């Protein structure tokens, strides 16, 4: 154990014991490490088609090593003025797809969390963090389906800045933030200006008193750059409990206004049925009104099942119509997502 000169001097004078000091420092390190969580995922897949060419996967039919993620974090502890951190890395094709730059390594998150004992408590996030809008996320295993919806590609992915989140009352949470750009993800949606972007969102959770709707959530979010030439995105989404056992519903709407005056909007409808223990069926229908004035639609059916521990295996069918460039297309995919 390395000690500073001040500690060594105190030990020589008999004020402290080197052994006890070393033990105290070791215990401090162990205490810090005990709250650190290491997690991540590894993804692999097979992409094919039924008859026509598969334009949905973005590459030729065949096997794919989608890549991996690795996260090291420490959650906010209870009590006032607590602190936390979060670092998340993407590797392989997942890094290339997310960053838009083709690199096999990408820093997705690098932020510090801070708690302020103000009102009901304010949680601050400083650094590089995920966007507050959107129904789907980068990790496919956390989504109802493997392939992303049209709306996902309209949204910003990450922001570098400051985000403040707090609960106004039971079931009502708000978030406001200031960031460097509409999207801080390298190679995607960056306007390359020094103007700030502003983030705002409100989440409402249905109380238990409303019967089968209890636990349903609705979120409204808005992200805008601080200039007339900046992009804007308005998002409304919700997860809805249904009266049918083991069936949940979802909806998402994205309206993207580009700095050059173009506009695109997307709507997605979701239904997930927990067929049995370890088996689920996820359905999605989504549409896109693109910047070129064309309308494109897609339906997706995803059968998920858990055979191996920590592995989500999913078989997915996609069918797209209305794409002027590629025409109608269908996809057949098998995806394995290991999470630790």
Language model segments and positions:
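Gram-negative bacterial Sec-dependent N-terminal signal peptides
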Residues: 1-24
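Short glycine/proline-enriched turn or capping motifs at secondary-structure junctions
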Residues: 6, 103-106, 194, 229-231, ...
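Outer membrane beta-barrel
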Residues: 25-184, 192-199, 203-210, 267-270, ...
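Solvent-exposed loop segments that connect transmembrane elements
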Residues: 99, 185-193, 225-227, 259-262, ...
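Detector for outer-membrane/organellar transmembrane beta-barrel domains
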Residues: 198-292, 297-298
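Outer-membrane beta-barrel "beta-signal"
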Residues: 204, 305-307, 328-340
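Short Gly/Pro-enriched loop/turn and capping motifs at secondary-structure junctions
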Residues: 258, 288-290, 308-310, 320-322
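C-terminal closing repeat unit and adjoining cap/tail of repeat-based domains
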Residues: 300-317
């Amino acid at each position: 154990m390395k000690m500073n000169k001040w500690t060594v001097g105190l030990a020589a004078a008999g004020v402290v014991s080197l052994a006890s000091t070393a033990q105290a420092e070791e215990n401090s390190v162990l205490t810090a490490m005990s709250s650190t969580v290491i997690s991540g995922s590894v993804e692999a897949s097979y992409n094919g088609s039924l008859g026509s060419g598969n334009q949905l996967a973005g590459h030729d039919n065949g096997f794919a090593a989608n890549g991996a993620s690795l996260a090291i974090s420490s959650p906010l502890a209870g009590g006032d003025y607590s602190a936390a951190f979060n670092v998340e890395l993407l590797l392989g094709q997942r890094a290339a797809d997310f960053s838009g730059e083709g690199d096999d390594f990408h820093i997705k998150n690098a932020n510090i969390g801070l708690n302020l004992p103000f009102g009901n408590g304010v949680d601050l996030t400083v650094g590089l963090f995920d966007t507050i809008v959107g129904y789907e996320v980068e990790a496919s295993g956390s989504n109802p389906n493997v392939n992303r919806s049209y709306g996902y590609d309209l949204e910003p992915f990450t922001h570098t800045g400051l985000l403040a989140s707090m609960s106004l009352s039971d079931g009502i949470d708000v978030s406001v933030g200031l960031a460097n750009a509409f999207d801080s993800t390298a190679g995607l949606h960056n306007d390359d200006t020094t103007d700030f972007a502003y983030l705002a969102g409100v989440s409402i959770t249905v109380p238990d008193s409303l019967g089968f709707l209890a636990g349903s959530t609705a979120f409204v979010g808005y992200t805008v750059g601080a200039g007339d030439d900046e992009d804007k995105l308005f998002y409304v989404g919700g997860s809805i409990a249904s009266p049918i056992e083991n069936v949940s519903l979802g909806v998402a709407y994205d309206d993207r206004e580009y700095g050059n005056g173009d506009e695109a909007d997307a709507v997605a409808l979701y239904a997930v049925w927990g067929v049995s223990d370890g088996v689920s069926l996820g359905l999605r229908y989504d549409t896109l009104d693109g910047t070129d004035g064309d309308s494109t639609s897609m339906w997706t059916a995803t059968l998920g099942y858990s055979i191996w521990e920590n592995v989500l295996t999913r078989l997915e069918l996609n069918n797209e119509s209305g794409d002027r460039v590629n025409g109608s297309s269908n996809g057949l995919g098998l995806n394995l997502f290991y999470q630790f």
